[in-house]
């Protein structure tokens, strides 16, 4: 079965076939239109939360411990960086020079001067070379590119 055919009915069997454990629980914290997905492996765990109110497009509202507000369009770039002046400008310049159009840029931080997270929704695909160049920028700790199918 292909990953693109993932749905609520077959999620458990697909996860188990790949050696993953899947558990479901309900919480009023996210409301009736919210969902949270937690992934763990080895010593790491990440949780992503979002909302999809009826009749409205979905939005990501949390990535890890960071509160964000961004639509999962074609491609999402997720960066972790130091919260210092110039990071957003350097990222925007690099993406613009690479021909990548920014649809939304959401920067979140836990504390001034500490770790920050950028959730950047862009038009079209982003190649591995752009990701590698983002990692070369000062104060960028990690760069992840997520391509959404059918977004």
Regions from the PLM with identified roles:
Residues 1-151:
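NAD(P)-dependent dehydrogenase/reductase Rossmann-like domain
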